[in-house]
Amino acid sequence: MSVTMRQMLEAGVHFGHQTRYWNPKMAPYIFGERNKIHIINLEKTLPLFEDALKYVRQLSANKGRILFVGTKRQARDIIKEEAQRAGCPYVNHRWLGGMLTNFKTVKQSIKRLTEYEALLQDGGIEKFGKKEALGYKREVEKLERSIGGIKEMGGLPDAIFIIDVGHESGAVTEAAKLGIPVIGVVDTNNSPEGVAYVIPGNDDSSRAIRLYARGIADAVLEGRNQSINEIVKAASEEEFVEVEEVAAE
């Protein structure tokens, strides 16, 4: 999927924050100001977003794992929906400290969640008293909200896509410690430091958030399809060679 300048304008990607909240490190991406609001230069944003999409396509074609992160109210549902559509892990409620740097402990919580879910599904919960059964159900809800989106992740991601790097500063810091590249939407009030693929843009508008998340999800699917097509092509070429060899004999 390719995104156009018009689509970005319609989604309000160019609207930054109030000028008094600006981060000077975002100066290269700012076009100017209007009514005390910074206007982001979409001539900078569009090629940078395309670079990010190209990277995601390549990573996905090589079977890389991309974690979607967006826990602010406007992003939660969109992040979950687009990540699920692309078959990617996601965090959309709250970033728990150590989610990456202490993944061993997180894996234990995931194990507990899957065990409790199995108990609920096969009716094993019924052997407990009402109060205890309710406790299990509440624990499942709590775990599902915080780590449900990463229970199939299996290991650390190869890259992280983040909406609002300021709001998700914990995720950016942990990714930097582990050398995991960050693809981040950076508004005019935040710093692009520590972000490998900067997408300068509005991080508050749900339309803009949808545009970024849909683009990344599409790139994941395109990369995966490219990988499958290459495998099929390679397999058919091998068969063709074998047929030729048999014919030669």
Swiss-Prot record:
It comes from the Bacteria. This is Small ribosomal subunit protein uS2. PROSITE patterns: RIBOSOMAL_S2_1, RIBOSOMAL_S2_2. Belongs to the universal ribosomal protein uS2 family. One of its GO terms (biological process) is translation. HAMAP family: Ribosomal_uS2_B. Keywords: Ribonucleoprotein, Ribosomal protein. It comes from Methylobacillus flagellatus (strain ATCC 51484 / DSM 6875 / VKM B-1610 / KT). One of its GO terms (molecular function) is structural constituent of ribosome. GO terms for cellular component: cytosolic small ribosomal subunit.
